[in-house]
Amino acid sequence: PVREGYTFTGWYADKDLTEKISTIKMTSNKTVYAGWEATGVPDWLNGADHFAYIIGDDEGYVRPLANVTRAETAAIFFRLLKEDVREEYLTDRSGFADVEQGAWYNKAVSTMAALGVVKGYTEDTFAPHEAITRAEFAAICARFDTGTSDGESSFTDISGHWAESEIRRAAQLGWIQGDPDGRFRPNAPITRAEAMTIINRVLNRLPEEKEDLLEGMKEWPDALPGAWYYLAVQEATNSHAYERKGEVYERWSALNVNPDWAQYQR
């Protein structure tokens, strides 16, 4: 089971969640109870400051259904690091032959590799311009977490996959979901909308409805209200102050100036 903003802790025999079940023998109808706890933000990531981490293109589009490259993914998570973590691990030496010193993504890839969060295609290549897969993206998210997966995955297509344990952990934390038919599609490229949705879950950046946003925010002609990804895109592309709305959701309280990330692209 998946619940946005929560980690699944297991099945229990009682409503007070004191008797955890590992196996159950069905001889009659039984009621079991799902255990949940709010998922915290990983220690290396900045979940407190809700700044824009996605930038649209020069034509004014955010391209929610386009793929995300491996370099772009490294840059996104580089921006989302806590400042002290980013400065401690900051480097422009990646060890990858295809990540050139003058490339705009060099510091991002190099720093994230130094953290052990991103991996190469081979020992000495990163393939920065290749579209990142759903499995690769889930694995990056899971590497920020220090826990281990508990129980079997509900996905039908990840058994034996190189990222099976990372996918299972990301699912347990409520960060990723599969198709209605139970597939995760690990080798399919992830879209920008899917990536933003997952990142917002990782960071607990979750407006519940359009009324939680503010007038005057940046909006996009290719991410209109009514699209399943509308809230995720708005959250990812607008810097804002916020107030908590219950245990998981948020309500914006002010719009802020977006950070200038160009200093790390030189």
Question: Where are each of the predicted segments found?
Answer:
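Extracellular interaction modules
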Residues: 16-38, 104-108, 228-232
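Extracellular/surface recognition and adhesion modules
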Residues: 8-11, 34, 112, 170
